[in-house]
């Protein structure tokens, strides 16, 4: 979650509001909602713009709304900025369950809602629920303009519902920001996306203005991409398998040789020594576990192995031409012929390939096996 009590109007707020149609400020009826007002940055800026456009206090009060689960936040923001809109205390989970069937919808739903919530030493992502509810609360043709994490841009996974939403609705603008931007803007070591979508069905040819993290802006048809990289779109898409091309075979399992399994141990035993790669050091030295079973896959398969240890630039790799290693859930492998594996390793360890993977990270700084699985089988030829 980004800063919830930051009271200056950030440049990012100004830019996001600037990207909305100018007519929403001159209109006397446009309705606004911030689903989690926090310190009031957005509603403050909205009220000020409406006031600058000549609207009365009564008019502004009738159409600027906000929710926040902390009454302290609401009182502080209202008193500090003399806010006149209608701001209601509501727990996030209650907001997510709002029955919007008979609710009057909003022309603009905008804000920077919290990323996650913490309960009983556990945390869960709540930003997807904010995105879904924001679209539900927007009028037909209305706008949803939110800041949230970048996980939805990854290959198919737990945020598919957000990816499907943004590619079926009209996503007009996407601004991708790296960890350095997160520290600078919010004082948080997290990457984030700024998304501005219109609540209309997108056409098959719709192109989104994507501002990549290297400040390059391109018009992109997101429907044609298996994932959305952070930068270097042209170079990344060169190695992605096209229709009809054979993709890379990636080997991975969350359960075959997990360290907690009864047949896996850190201690050598009288059983045949069957290796399970747990992690690799930056010098490509395997940290091994021992398994009393070899019937759960991986063994006997020639492959190039890497793991989650180290970041994208420092992670090691090893050639397992004989297929003597199994993989824990922390390790991954590219399957190929023993002849090709040394060349694949050369490509995999190259600076050029690692830079491609840097451009594909959606969260943690590890080499993303889901992304590699979208590459064409002979991708390595581009790097050797």
What residues fall within each predicted segment?
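Flexible, charged surface loops at secondary-structure boundaries
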Residues: 25-27, 57-59, 101-104, 296-300
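Eukaryotic short linear interaction motifs
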Residues: 16, 72-74, 313-314
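Signature of N6-adenine DNA methyltransferases within the class I
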Residues: 6-12, 36-44, 50-51, 55-63, ...
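Conserved class I S-adenosyl-L-methionine
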Residues: 28-38
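C-terminal substrate-recognition regions of SAM-dependent nucleic acid methyltransferases
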Residues: 3, 104, 180-384
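S-adenosyl-L-methionine
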Residues: 1-28, 42
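Conserved acidic residues
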Residues: 30, 107, 303
